[in-house]
C-alpha cells in the first residue's frame, strides 16, 4: 500500500479537483468493498471540504457475478422502485457523484451472454432518466480508480501480487499527476489549461468533418454537426456552477460527431473491456452514420450486444483526440480499463452523445438533439483507435483541408 500521505493527497484530489463538493452539498460515493481505507479518506476529505452529507454506496463485482449467474432473469430485470426513488431524491437535492473504479478484468467471463445482455438492457432502460444528470453535467461527477489484486495481476502478470499492486498504485498516481512533493490540485489546474488550448483551436476552425487514416487500416470520415463544441478537462455544473473534472485521469479533447455522416472503416488499436468481457482485435464499417459490418477476433457476441443495445447504439456519440505521445501513452501499459486506456489513444464512442458538446444542447430534448444530428442512446461505450502513425485532416465549410494530427500527434 502507498503511504498514508499519498493516499490522503489522492483523496483530496478526488474530492476537491475531481467532484469538487460544495458547502452543504450531498456527495454520493460509489465504492468497491475491496478498498475501504481509501473510501473513508474520501469521505473525511469531503466533510472537511464542507459536504453536508456523504452517502457510501458499496459494490462488490464478485457478488454481482453471483447474482447474475444464479438469480432468475425476471428478478434481475426488475429494478426496484426504491432504487429509482433514491436516485430521484439525490438529484432533487443537487447532489454530486464520485465513483471509485476498481475493475476486475474478465469478472463476468463464462456467464450466459444472452441473460447478461437482457439484464443490462433492463437496467439501462430503468435508469435512463437519471443518466442525463451526469451526461449533461447538471451536477458534478467524477471517476477515479484504485487497484485490486486481480486487476494488478492482469496488468503486471510477471510480478508477485504485492509488487503488482504497488506498481499499479504508482502507475495510477502518475496518470493523475500526483507525486510525494507536489500539490496535485494546482497541478490539475495547469493541466486543464493545456487541454483548453486544444479546445479553443479546434472550436475556431468549425470543421465540417475529420478524416482519419492509420497504419492498421482505418480510413474513416467523421462528420461534425453544425454547432458542435469541443470540450475537455474541467467542466462547470449547470445547477451548482461548480467547476469539476469528470475523469481522472484525462488527456482528451472531444466533441459529438454527426449521427448520420460517418463513413468508412475503423480498426480498434486496444482491447475493449465491456461489462467484464474483453473484446479484442475488432473493426467496424460505417455507412451514413451506422455500423453496417463488424468483426472481433474475441468476444464478438459482446460487441454485437453493444451494437444492438438499442436503435441508436450502432451510431457514434463521441470523437476524442489524444496525442500518441501523451503521458499515459508513453507509459506503454495496457490497463484493461477504459478510464485509462481511452486516455492513451484517440477514441470513438458508440451510443449517446454529450449534450454539452452541442450549442444549447444541455437544454434540448432528445428529439431536438436528434434534429441537430446528435445521437441519443441508452449506452455510451468508448473504444480506442489511435496509433503512432495516425493522420487526421480537418475539412472546413469552405472545403479547406487543415492538418490536425501527423504521426499520431497534434500539429498545433
Model regions and ranges:
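Active-site bordering "gate/hinge" segments
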Residues: 1-263, 394, 400, 410-412
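Short solvent-exposed loop/turn micro-motifs enriched in small/polar/acidic residues
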Residues: 12, 203-205, 275-277, 312, ...
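A short secondary-structure junction signal
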Residues: 109-111, 153-157, 233-235, 277-280, ...
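Short linear motifs in exposed loops
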Residues: 223, 294-295, 405
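Long, well-ordered mid-to-C-terminal structural blocks that present hydrophobic/aromatic surfaces
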Residues: 253-309
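Active-site lining segments that contact anionic ligands and/or coordinate catalytic metals
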Residues: 261-263, 279-281, 288-291, 314-318, ...
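Dual-mode signal for accessory low-complexity, basic/Gly-rich regions
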Residues: 293-362
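Extended hydrophobic packing segments that form well-structured cores
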Residues: 367-412
